[in-house]
Amino acid sequence: MEVIAENRKARFEYFILEEFEAGMVLLSSEVKSLRERKVNISDAYVTEKNGEIWLHNMHIAEYKAANKKKHKPKRERKLLLHKKEINKLISQIKTAGVTIVPLSIYFNDKGLVKTRIAIVKGKKLYDKRATIKQREWNRAKSRLSKNNL
């Protein structure tokens, strides 16, 4: 599994309730840009339209060597999931305070582009402070253990 992009902001901004793996419908120039790692998913989110799941606001830079089949960098991209997963996501989207965001994009073992999406709930400011405090404490512990060895 070769990770192309990761949404680190999502793990800080949200509580992750459940994760899914989804395929994406892409154009050839988009895949080539992904191989060059020219993608940004920090502001991306997932919505439902006509019983299908769509990824919005993901920026894939234009592939410079593409002649005719250039793509729009921020176009909507359809996500491929099983019907049972789609129904679960649609029911969660309608819940107040819950959203769906991509966590990472990667090439699987077969060379297909996959995205890991998650059902998330927003953190309050005090939750974010607690996360920072815990992270700093873990760093301090590791420094102390290195110095004691």
Curated annotation (Swiss-Prot):
Tagged with keyword GTP-binding: no
One MF annotation (Gene Ontology) recorded for this entry: RNA binding
A GO cellular component annotation in the UniProt record: cytosol
A Pfam family of this chain: SmpB
Functional description taken from the UniProt entry: Required for rescue of stalled ribosomes mediated by trans-translation. Binds to transfer-messenger RNA (tmRNA), required for stable association of tmRNA with ribosomes. tmRNA and SmpB together mimic tRNA shape, replacing the anticodon stem-loop with SmpB. tmRNA is encoded by the ssrA gene; the 2 termini fold to resemble tRNA(Ala) and it encodes a 'tag peptide', a short internal open reading frame. During trans-translation Ala-aminoacylated tmRNA acts like a tRNA, entering the A-site of stalled ribosomes, displacing the stalled mRNA.
Entry similarity comment: Belongs to the SmpB family.
UniProt protein name: SsrA-binding protein
